[in-house]
Amino acid sequence: MGLPWYRVHTVVLNDPGRLLSVHIMHTALVAGWAGSMALYELAVFDPSDPVLDPMWRQGMFVIPFMTRLGITNSWGGWNITGGTITNPGLWSYEGVAGAHIVFSGLCFLAAIWHWVYWDLEIFCDERTGKPSLDLPKIFGIHLFLSGVACFGFGAFHVTGLYGPGIWVSDPYGLTGKVQPVNPAWGVEGFDPFVPGGIASHHIAAGTLGILAGLFHLSVRPPQRLYKGLRMGNIETVLSSSIAAVFFAAFVVAGTMWYGSATTPIELFGPTRYQWDQGYFQQEIYRRVSAGLAENQSVSEAWSKIPEKLAFYDYIGNNPAKGGLFRAGSMDNGDGIAVGWLGHPVFRNKEGRELFVRRMPTFFETFPVVLVDGDGIVRADVPFRRAESKYSVEQVGVTVEFYGGELNGVSYSDPATVKKYARRAQLGEIFELDRATLKSDGVFRSSPRGWFTFGHASFALLFFFGHIWHGARTLFRDVFAGIDPDLDAQVEFGAFQKLGDPTTKRQAV
């Protein structure tokens, strides 16, 4: 046939049987990848420390998606929250992976069957005997079925009526677990961080889809609309389908990057905005202040801060710190977190408490500056010693740790104080194991960053695909040079533009 690579899909343009076949094969490839990727991740995943080495630090991509839908147990005898289990049941991580692979195999066989048996009666128009698809009717069927699936997910799976529920956590990602969710029918259901909105929106959208599907099954489109939107052309279907996909990709890129109830930080890691706004730092200080108000000592108040909360307040977990083209998990970057060293409190020789100014997201290096409670600079690590006025040595800065492994330990040696001041720029201080994975010390992004980048990139690509195929289907007659209303019998090749006698070719 000699088709160029970018036109090979035209072979299924007027062949409904094989058009169906290639779509089934595509589904087989997607399901097969999902199942295989899940098995690979399970083979390399270490579930032993869900606090300091969670799935998102290890670069897991499909495990978080299974977990948010209610899968928490493994046939390996472990639970995602760190416990051990004896009866994981069929729908474990491995069970879901296996189901995808079996489904992929069945789709593969179905695709081959439909490729071989492409000339089925169901695809024939009984009036003409030629292959033909009733596209508005097919649209109605698909809309109805997707509406049923959408409604069923919201009404049964999410609510726990028939299913496990979904992953729900507190605003600081500390108490997450799978639980049933009641639909939120009030205005709170529009808050992207309210899990109840997931149930209510699926129920509402599913109901709308069912009704719209029934409408399109029972009502034929007007002839002018049918012709105007080229509803008989399969490329119209391609164009509008691409539009639906790129729109969805843009939406999920946003919900992933900015955060929502559908992308819990326990499964995908924190967002960059939580670092930018000092979200976890404020909560830590609030808890410490509450502890001090209850007459706890400073050491006791800091010791009650959950290690999980402290770990979120560390710049190495910020998805915007990893370069887009740095391959590997966060653990391959700064290392595997082993333990919290505690919160460093710096003081000058007058006893005034000093705070290290934190590194903004998009800086690789940042000057070490210590300010007091009023934001006035009191100490720093100078670039040029000859002009320094606030150096750690001159100001006499000391550091004392509260909570964590160094609780109660203090240092006055300037070199040690400067070391911890530099590390305090990056948030709470953790001991990191860089030997096990030969980590290079360069920050990596989390699956939150990869997902966003991938979906935003493909959404942009698919947006152009929608414009391209939409233009092709709407202006097909212009591009082909054939007037769709042309009734006269014309000879191909006689004119430069088909049927236009003013463009008669010159005899050679």
Curated annotation (Swiss-Prot):
The chain crosses the membrane at residues 21-36, 101-115, 140-156, 203-218, 237-252, 457-472. Signal peptide: none annotated. Keywords: Chlorophyll, Chloroplast, Chromophore, Membrane, Photosynthesis, Photosystem II, Plastid, Thylakoid, Transmembrane, Transmembrane helix. One of its GO terms (cellular component) is chloroplast thylakoid membrane. It is a multi-pass membrane protein. It is found in: Plastid, Chloroplast thylakoid membrane. GO terms for biological process: photosynthetic electron transport in photosystem II. Binds multiple chlorophylls. PSII binds additional chlorophylls, carotenoids and specific lipids. Gene3D superfamilies: Photosystem II CP47 reaction center protein. It comes from the Eukaryota. GO terms for molecular function: chlorophyll binding; electron transporter, transferring electrons within the cyclic electron transport pathway of photosynthesis activity. One of the components of the core complex of photosystem II (PSII). It binds chlorophyll and helps catalyze the primary light-induced photochemical processes of PSII. PSII is a light-driven water:plastoquinone oxidoreductase, using light energy to abstract electrons from H(2)O, generating O(2) and a proton gradient subsequently used for ATP formation. Belongs to the PsbB/PsbC family. PsbB subfamily. This is Photosystem II CP47 reaction center protein. It comes from Arabis hirsuta (Hairy rock-cress).
